[in-house]
Amino acid sequence: VPAGRSQVPPGTELYIKPMFYCADGFLLPDADKTQFVLHVFKVPMPGDQGFSACFSSFARSWPNMAPTDAKASCLYPNGQRAIREAAEKGFDNAIMLDGDGNIAEFATSNLWIAKDGVVSTPADNGTFLNGITRRRVLALLKADGVDVRERSLTRADVEAADEVFSSGNYGKVVHVNRVEDRALEYGPMARRAHKLYMDYAESTGKK
């Protein structure tokens, strides 16, 4: 990373992606041959415009079907198919369900809703990655006095929500401006979650 600083102007927004992969093995990769690569590339942070989402026909896998407890590259095609389907309908992202028909997450990030001042996010049932950003946002909101609940969410819950937003490594906290044909405002809970996270990240980065 230090060697590449001269190639990047100050203030450039970068995405840093650490990756582990097995360099040997055929059907069964040789874990002892695991190698590491750090992928750094320029990509701007999302703006305040938010993103649109629709419900996907593709479902998230159960943990006995795929390594859902890891950020594994083999899981990406599942989300990519959902995003392609959403794009063909004119949406930016997709809301994916689990095998029971409950909300799992967005194709690329965890999902949150706000209704009557209460923030809810799907309970960790093993069908999605309980990511670092999700856990951080959850802790920050609770510490700030917000009523936050981890529970099963249905499509009807999302459709009736006052706000919908996401959390993830790339966008951090980003609000949803439209679910299907219903427009949504950048509401107070999404703004609060975004500010809490960015304030935390800035204060941590200065240490």
How should each PLM-predicted stretch be described?
Residues 1-26:
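Short, acidic/charged, Gly/Pro-enriched secondary-structure junctions
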Residues 2-3, 21, 29-207:
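Helix-start/capping segments and mature chain N-termini
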